[in-house]
């Protein structure tokens, strides 16, 4: 598929506020949710619609509804911070969860939790995580979701960087990636530059 950087003045402004090291957890969360909400319009531009008969106060007519359920899959824990913004526009979206951790010695990604929704294989699935760095967590999450039988998957993040983008597209060419920003590079320790710092810590006020 493809990588899409959503360059919108409102998104750029809010992301700049999030990058500042002095930004409070409250303001960080609020801007994160607002950006996620703004991204929804582009992410769901290609949803299929189904014609239905509806009745207005004046007459019967043809209306349209999204043809499949939408499922959001946050990668724990930072991905949770993006849910509220998306759910404000899609309150009927179902929520699945995937928990991953990285082995500090081998650097391998391991699953510690996964909970899917009913009929997820017939849904539009959006995996959300604020950061796409090496692509290890994203690839693992996509593997899990595909194991549930899902065919229509998109990965949505706040900031993305190479080699993560290429790693995901190479392994999963059928998955679209959306980001608010394509950042410059990874540091020697694997941090995104300029990045946001540790998104999970900044969302939840932990260290």
Curated annotation (Swiss-Prot):
Entry EC number(s): 2.4.2.9
Residues binding 5-phospho-alpha-D-ribose 1-diphosphate, per UniProt: 77, 102, 129-137, 198
Alphabetized Gene3D superfamilies for the sequence: 3.40.50.2020
Catalysis: reaction(s): UMP + diphosphate = 5-phospho-alpha-D-ribose 1-diphosphate + uracil
Activity regulation annotation text: Allosterically activated by GTP.
Enzyme class of the recorded protein, top EC level: transferase
Cofactor requirement: Mg(2+)
Short name of one Pfam family: UPRTase
Binding note for cofactor: Binds 1 Mg(2+) ion per subunit. The magnesium is bound as Mg-PRPP.
GO molecular-function terms, A-Z: GTP binding; magnesium ion binding; uracil phosphoribosyltransferase activity
Pathway(s) it belongs to: Pyrimidine metabolism; UMP biosynthesis via salvage pathway; UMP from uracil: step 1/1
Biological process per Gene Ontology, one example term: uracil salvage
Positions with a binding annotation for uracil: 192, 197-199
Keywords: Allosteric enzyme, Glycosyltransferase, GTP-binding, Magnesium, Nucleotide-binding, Transferase
HAMAP family: Upp_B
Its biological purpose: Catalyzes the conversion of uracil and 5-phospho-alpha-D-ribose 1-diphosphate (PRPP) to UMP and diphosphate.
NCBIfam families in the cross-refs: PRK00129.1, upp
Family: Belongs to the UPRTase family.
Protein name from the UniProt record: Uracil phosphoribosyltransferase
